[in-house]
């Protein structure tokens, strides 16, 4: 009998072992769909981004006009731009749900997979930030100014780093051209990191909702989960096209319809919605360096998750106290996101400070203590 090409060809064999004959736990739920959705998001963003880059000019005098030209005069340029801008939002929705799943079901105990995942999140955040600057609207310009300025809080070398990043003494043409170069490059870095992420994942196999070893009950990825993933793709594309066609500017800032002007500061400088939780944490500390450290800690703290796992059970499926804390954390993140979008005045300042304090307390103190407490309760 002739050998099956899918199982013998060096390249096809790798694809087969990753996407076709991959042994998969039979009980993984829809929460395990977001990894493949993130892959589709990345492919969509690279494709639409490439088409946009063909019509974009990375120059301060022409950037805004070139984006306008794309939307008005290029065939379906408006659609490509709307899909790209809103695709970024869906990318972040998927990655936040993917991380939430990891925290809830103890997936962070696969340390290498988890750590590469955090690196992926950081790279995605960097990509989205430099991408937001490219249309060269008011919020693009002032967002770039404010966020890059945070590096000046680093003692001794901070100011030098900022001027080096800007390519001058303010955000200007050199900044825009290098941000375009970075925005083109970073998605391919994300693609490379994704392959590393998957390599580490396939070393151990997937976790599952029960957190039990599932070697005795695995099924092939195709056709079962390939079909399930296609359903996920369809639902996501339906949501994305609905948003891009019916309300493309829902998540954007009206300020960005005004070309960048260094002489006029917008009344409220705020990032896109997916950074608001971190922005609220940054603003809640009335000291520049302290705020920057809190901002960095809000994401980098996830590297500690595997070390702070004190429970004898892997997932939160049978741990009601930890579940309560987890959903409190989710609600807290919604509050932080809302506060980040509000002006810096009386009720919002204190709400932001309390929510920031709660965020760190739950992750660093309450979850490990609760895990240890639940271990004690197992004895009774």
From Swiss-Prot:
It is found in: Mitochondrion inner membrane. Heme b b566 binds at residues 98, 197. Pfam families: Cytochrom_B_C, Cytochrome_B. GO terms for biological process: mitochondrial electron transport, ubiquinol to cytochrome c. GO terms for cellular component: mitochondrial inner membrane; respiratory chain complex III. It comes from the Eukaryota. The chain crosses the membrane at residues 34-54, 78-99, 114-134, 179-199, 227-247, 289-309, 321-341, 348-368. Heme b b562 binds at residues 84, 183. Keywords: Electron transport, Heme, Iron, Membrane, Metal-binding, Mitochondrion, Mitochondrion inner membrane, Respiratory chain, Transmembrane, Transmembrane helix, Transport, Ubiquinone. It is a multi-pass membrane protein. Its cofactor is heme b. Binds 2 heme b groups non-covalently. GO terms for molecular function: metal ion binding; ubiquinol-cytochrome-c reductase activity. Belongs to the cytochrome b family. Heme 1 (or BL or b562) is low-potential and absorbs at about 562 nm, and heme 2 (or BH or b566) is high-potential and absorbs at about 566 nm. This is Cytochrome b. The gene is MT-CYB.
């Amino acid at each position: 009998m002739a050998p099956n090409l899918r199982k013998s060809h060096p390249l096809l064999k790798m694809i087969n072992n990753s996407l076709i004959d991959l042994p998969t736990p039979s009980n993984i739920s829809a929460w395990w769909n977001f990894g493949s959705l993130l892959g589709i998001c990345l492919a969509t963003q690279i494709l639409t981004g490439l088409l946009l880059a063909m019509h974009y000019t990375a120059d301060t005098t022409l950037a805004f006009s070139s984006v306008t030209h794309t939307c008005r005069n290029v065939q379906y340029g408006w659609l490509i731009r709307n899909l790209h801008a809103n695709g970024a939002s869906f990318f972040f929705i998927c990655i936040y749900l993917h991380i939430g799943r990891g925290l809830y079901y103890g997936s962070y105990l696969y340390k290498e997979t988890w750590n590469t995942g955090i690196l992926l999140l950081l790279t995605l955040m960097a990509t989205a930030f430099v991408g937001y600057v490219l249309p060269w609207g008011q919020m693009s310009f002032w967002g770039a100014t404010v966020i890059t300025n945070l590096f000046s809080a680093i003692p001794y070398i901070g100011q030098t780093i900022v001027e080096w990043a800007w390519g001058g003494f303010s955000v200007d043409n050199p900044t825009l051209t290098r941000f375009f170069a970075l925005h083109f490059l970073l998605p391919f870095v994300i693609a490379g990191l994704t392959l590393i992420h998957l390599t580490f994942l396939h070393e151990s196999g997937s976790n599952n909702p029960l957190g039990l070893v599932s070697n005795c009950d695995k099924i092939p990825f195709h056709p079962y989960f390939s079909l399930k993933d296609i359903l996920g793709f369809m639902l996501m594309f339906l949501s994305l096209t609905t948003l891009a066609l019916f309300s493309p500017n829902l998540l954007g800032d009206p300020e960005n319809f005004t070309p960048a002007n260094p002489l006029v500061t917008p009344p409220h400088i705020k990032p896109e919605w997916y950074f608001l939780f971190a922005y609220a944490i940054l603003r809640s500390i009335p000291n520049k360096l302290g705020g920057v450290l809190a901002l960095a800690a809000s994401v980098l703290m996830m590297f500690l998750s595997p070390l702070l796992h004190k429970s004898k059970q892997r997932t939160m499926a049978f741990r009601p106290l930890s579940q309560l804390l987890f959903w409190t954390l989710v609600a807290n993140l919604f509050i932080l996101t809302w506060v980040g979008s509000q002006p810096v005045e009386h009720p919002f300042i204190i709400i932001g400070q309390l929510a920031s304090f709660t965020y760190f307390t739950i992750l660093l103190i309450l979850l490990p203590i609760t895990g240890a407490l639940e271990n004690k309760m197992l004895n009774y």
